[in-house]
């Protein structure tokens, strides 16, 4: 009753239907840290220190048959996006690379504004 067939799912963490014991719990393993993450962190650290991180970046890429790349911060961030998808690292990566509050609306990216809820404006006409 708790497993639904509708909607999109990421294959990386597919539900193990055979592992249900009480109809609610699944026995899927989740990834905490991976060697590819360690290699990408090392590559990033080397690049930030003025060294070459090409070897570490390309070890990750070679595993999936991708061509070699020069380790730049932009290439490392893109590789982290592809390699660590759905593992919960993207927000931290964007903050660390100073791209989280990127200007997307033509306004300064240093402030976040939230709209006033419609219900609050209806209750208080002074809110505009």
Model-identified regions with their sequence ranges:
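Flexible, polar/acidic helix-loop-strand segments at domain edges
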Residues: 1-34
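Short, glycine- and charge-enriched coil/turn segments that flank and shape catalytic ligand pockets
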Residues: 51, 66-69
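Long, intrinsically disordered, low-complexity segments
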Residues: 25, 30, 61, 68-128
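Extended, hydrophobic/aromatic-rich amphipathic alpha-helical segments that build helical scaffolds
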Residues: 29-59, 74-85
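A generic alpha-helix propensity feature with a strong bias for hydrophobic helices
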Residues: 4, 36, 118-120
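Intrinsically disordered, low-complexity segments enriched in polar/charged small residues
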Residues: 14-17, 39, 66, 85
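A broad, low-specificity signal marking well-ordered, structured residues that form hydrophobic/aromatic
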Residues: 8-11, 57, 74, 92
């Amino acid at each position: 009753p708790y497993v639904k067939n509708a909607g999109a799912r990421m294959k990386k963490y597919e539900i193990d239907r055979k592992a249900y014991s009480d109809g609610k719990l699944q026995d899927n393993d989740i990834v905490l840290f991976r060697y590819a993450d360690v290699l990408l962190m090392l590559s990033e650290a080397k690049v930030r220190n003025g060294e070459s991180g090409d070897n570490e970046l390309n070890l990750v890429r070679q595993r999936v048959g991708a061509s070699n790349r020069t380790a730049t911060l932009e290439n490392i961030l893109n590789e982290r996006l592809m390699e660590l998808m759905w593992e919960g690292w993207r927000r931290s990566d964007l903050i660390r690379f100073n791209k989280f509050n990127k200007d997307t609306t033509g306004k300064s990216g240093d402030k976040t504004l939230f709209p006033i809820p419609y219900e609050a404006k209806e209750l208080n006409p002074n809110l505009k």
